[in-house]
Amino acid sequence: EMSASLVGSEMCIRDRYDMDGGDVASSIYYGLFSLQHRGQESCGIAVSRTDGEKRNSQMIKGMGLVNEVFDAEKLEQLHGDIGVGHVRYSTAGASIPENTQPLVLNYIKGTLMVAHNGNLVNAVDLRRELELMGAIFHTSIDSEVIAYLIARERLHVGTVEDAVKLAMQKIRGAYSLVVASPRKMIGARDPFGFHPLCIGKRDNAYFFSSESCALDTVGAEFVRDVAPGEIVTITPQGIQSDRSMASDKCARCIFEYIYFARPDRYIDGICVHSSRLTAGKILAQEHPVDADIVVGVPESGNAAAMGYSMESGIPYGTAFVKNSYVGRTFIKPKQSARESSVMVKLNALREVVNGKRVIMIDDSIVRGTTSARIVKMIRDAGAKEVHVRISSPPFMYCLL
């Protein structure tokens, strides 16, 4: 975020539809663990089920990590055959309980469960327009604007997917979107393909996920990515695709490859680990330096450091011990929290860097919080020289 190309993106969506009417909450719960790196401020799960002729929805959400919000007792309260899960990093809207996703909207046509990853550039104008028509907002997030737009359009068209399409014609910005109604699940991606969204299948259960690693966690097979501008509708009758919103121009978020995504996932057919490895090799070609060892800043800098080492012939080393109980510093909501997190997250291995000329590879500089403190950490551990190399070129003016 900040000066990189994910300004205002709320972190991740995951949705599951079980054609056999099974319970989905546990699958969503485990899948969210695989997406925890994308957002650590809050999370939630909403499910829906049929009781006789009546459709009931349930939702549990709260501030904190997945394992802090949910336990066995809470999961037992969630019974449904369709559900939506979400983990959040706040960008548009404050980090408060009211802004936790997913959103459940009850209206004259029934119930919608909505989760959104992205940021709208015209959200303020759309919110004002909806308020003038009588809408009352309970959050400050873009996702509620999208949910209200879909619900309002649904009053005038025959299907939820048609309502999603009409809403997409009005919203501008970056979004990967999941909408679940009682008997169908819809995944949509903005025409530029800014953020990822993929489809998975396990037996008769279907999934949408921001990253394919969540599919692996629940034993689902990766089917394909949702294409930029595509609306995918899943019902008991099968899968339907509408690509009429597709654009000739794609503008994928480069920061997904640089930082956000897990290295074991693929985005639009490109392996994240391989892209980072290649970036490190190019960095060694363009910015060589004579040194004794190449080290990466865990975790997203490691692959680029390996690539730099492979290309330069300088040995690769592990210079840091990481505290696995500390989250990603970049997605902490406050500067003070980011600075404190750096100090407890990493510690330098004196045995590795003492008396050596060190090339330190990091994936990017967003706020500079991590890099400055880690350079001091390596120097304090006895390094003679510290040469910082950044595997991402600067991106200054992304509005999304």
Residues of each region from the PLM?
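Positively charged, low-complexity/disordered segments
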Residues: 1-8
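Conserved short alpha-helical segments that host acidic/polar catalytic motifs at enzyme active sites
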Residues: 9-10, 14-228, 233-291, 297, ...
